Design a protein with these regions (language model features):
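Glycine-rich, aromatic-lined ligand/substrate-binding cores of catalytic
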Residues: 279-294
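Extracellular/periplasmic, surface-exposed regions of secreted and cell-surface proteins
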Residues: 1-224, 287, 291
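Conserved small-residue
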Residues: 161, 178-282
Length: 294
């Protein structure tokens, strides 16, 4: 179970369906955080201007039935940690029956926040028979709740800390054509195209991590499952074997025909420093669809 509390305020203004304004304010509390960081304030504002409602527009371009520009800017919060009550330590019984601390409390944990901005244009032609929507968006997520990097010498681990940030941006395009034939048959055709990128801006990683093993600065791929050695082909000759060092710089358990691992960083030995990220694209940068309605 998870307990939270929220207070929400919302106000809208609409003048002649032409000038639009909306403001939202949320004050939200979560049991994940200590009393000093329990509540977060998350405001947002949105404005819109339907230019096609102006008399000069309808007179000059009667075929251009809709032209609306809108913009929104606001923040949202997340308390999605890997476990509950981050400000409490947890204890367990060790192998000799003693009660010991196994996870240290994080009393400074706070809300993960995301600032989202969107600039949109809505277009309609021929009494909205043909329409398009275009949205440019970006999101900066900060104070992400992540597992901390800790030395195994500590003997315990800590609960999630606010240690990451990620940026997302892109464009969404939608188009639709709707019509009715002379025989009363209605149909519509539509498409959607989306382009986006998620990039990790900040990520807590061990000191001296090689650049090719880092998450920070790379596109976010949820399918990145870890690190692995890179296949360097097969041992094809005796010279090939004698030129291949292991993690100690020596040669062992090696014979013709078996595969070898690549000395990725070219330091003269094959070790954990040659591990490379296992990656896959779980969130494709380009998505699209086409639909027909009758």
């Amino acid at each position: 179970p998870h307990r939270g509390q929220a207070f929400v305020f919302r106000a809208t203004y609409d003048y002649a369906s032409k000038y639009l304004f909306e403001v939202n304010m949320g004050y939200t509390g979560s049991e994940q955080f200590s009393s000093k960081n329990r509540y977060g304030f998350f405001p947002s504002v949105a404005v819109g201007y339907v230019i096609s409602k102006e008399k000069f527009w309808r007179k000059a371009m009667p075929w251009w039935s809709k032209m609306k520009v809108r913009y929104s800017d606001g923040t949202v919060g997340s308390d999605n940690a890997s476990e509950n009550w981050l400000y409490y330590s947890t204890y367990s019984k060790n192998s000799v029956g003693l009660i010991v601390e196994d996870k240290a409390a994080n009393t400074t944990a706070r809300w993960e926040t995301a600032r989202k901005q969107d600039l949109g244009i809505e277009l309609g032609f021929f009494k909205d028979q043909l329409s398009f929507n275009v949205d440019l968006f970006q999101e900066l997520r900060t104070d992400m709740l992540l597992k901390p990097v800790e030395s195994p010498l500590l003997g315990i681990t800590s609960k999630d800390v606010n240690s990451g940030s990620m940026k997302k941006h892109g464009i969404d395009i939608e188009g639709k054509w709707r019509s009715t034939t002379s025989r009363g048959f209605y149909y519509e055709l539509g498409f959607m195209l989306g382009l986006n990128e998620n990039r990790i801006v900040k990520y807590d990683e061990p000191v001296n991590t090689p650049a090719y093993q880092k998450w920070e600065g790379t596109p976010y791929k949820a399918a990145r499952t870890g690190l692995e050695q890179i296949d360097g082909g097969y041992f094809a000759s005796v010279d090939d074997i004698h030129g291949y060092p292991n993690s100690l710089g020596s040669i062992d358990n090696t014979y013709l025909g078996i595969y070898k691992l690549l000395d990725f960083n070219a330091d003269g030995r094959v070790s954990n420093l040659d591990l490379h990220a296992i990656e896959g694209v779980a969130y494709p940068p380009i998505v699209g669809s086409f639909n027909i309605g009758l």
